[in-house]
């Protein structure tokens, strides 16, 4: 919060896992509206946008997050997409920002969910919304396109669970029984983002900062933001330093016609990394005609 206040950005994207299996609206209020922090101007002067994480899907209260965190207005999208209020496509200056919800980190058929989730259809519905959102004049004409979602859409490690395999079918191939990255979402969404010229996708979930540069398999970069651990793991005698575990604030701005991205390490207070991206090729899009006055 202090770093965000220091940077004083035009808006803030909160990239998920703010909560964990919340059952009451009072618990949500303590997290989102009345957090126990020293700064009392939290979210009072800066607009916040929220990309839910997998933990924000769990619990009775989290099924109705809109009671605390206002969903996008229905009049900005067709009736087909009214239930997709957690998605956003907005523009700040020369930067278009798209927010997607990767949902849970396990398959709907996973026995642990007892049939309570329908994320697979939800992700497909978001693909339909994304196709239209990328064609909106204010989005299509922006020199820079940045996408946000909680679970990464790429990972270089072959033994990391891609989220589309049931535990009983995985055998010993993967190191965990939950998704470390989201292959299904990548297959649904990234072809459209690539076609639109998206320069970077900013994700979270893994609790360790990582940068995935563009390569021959994908033209977009990916930043995996750090987690909540402040440089140490373990307790008591087992407590040890973990310099690779730190929260991050990822700052974006346009300078000299390029998108400048700076990754701030919230443990050291130093800049962890910085990157620069050229503008994408955009088509001049004519705004839709205004309706005639009645």
Language-model regions, residue ranges each:
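Residue-level marker for buried hydrophobic side chains located in beta-strands
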Residues: 12-14, 50-51, 147, 202
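Active-site glycine-centered loops adjacent to acidic/histidine catalytic or metal-binding residues
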Residues: 16-17, 53-54, 150, 204-205
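Extended active-site neighborhood of metal-dependent phosphoesterases/phosphodiesterases
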Residues: 23-140, 166-180, 188-194, 200, ...
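Short, flexible, mixed-charge acidic loops at enzyme active sites
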Residues: 159-166
């Amino acid at each position: 919060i202090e770093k965000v206040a220091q940077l004083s950005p035009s808006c803030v994207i909160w990239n998920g896992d703010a909560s964990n299996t919340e059952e009451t609206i009072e618990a949500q209020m303590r997290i989102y509206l009345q957090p126990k922090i020293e700064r009392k101007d939290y979210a009072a002067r800066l607009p916040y946008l929220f990309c839910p994480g997998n933990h924000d899907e769990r619990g009775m209260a989290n099924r109705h997050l809109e009671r605390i965190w206002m969903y996008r207005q229905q009049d900005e999208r067709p009736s087909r997409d009214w239930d997709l209020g957690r998605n956003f496509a907005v523009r700040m200056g020369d930067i278009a920002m798209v927010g997607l919800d990767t949902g849970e980190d396990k398959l709907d058929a996973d026995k642990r969910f007892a049939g309570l989730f329908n994320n697979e259809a939800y992700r497909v519905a978001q693909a339909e919304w994304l196709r239209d959102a990328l064609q909106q004049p204010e989005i299509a004409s922006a020199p820079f396109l940045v996408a946000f979602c909680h679970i990464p859409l790429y990972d270089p490690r072959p033994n990391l669970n891609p989220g589309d395999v049931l535990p009983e079918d995985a055998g010993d191939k993967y190191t965990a029984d939950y998704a470390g990255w989201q292959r299904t979402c990548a297959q649904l969404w990234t072809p459209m983002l690539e076609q639109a010229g998206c320069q970077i996708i900013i994700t979270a979930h893994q609790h360790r900062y990582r940068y995935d540069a563009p390569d021959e398999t994908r033209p977009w970069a990916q930043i995996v933001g750090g987690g909540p651990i402040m440089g140490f793991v373990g307790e008591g005698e087992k407590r040890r330093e973990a310099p690779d575990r730190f929260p991050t604030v990822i700052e974006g701005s346009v300078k000299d016609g390029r998108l400048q991205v700076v990754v701030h390490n919230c443990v050291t207070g130093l800049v962890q990394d910085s990157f620069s991206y050229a503008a994408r090729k955009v088509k001049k899009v004519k705004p839709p005609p205004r309706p005639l006055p009645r």
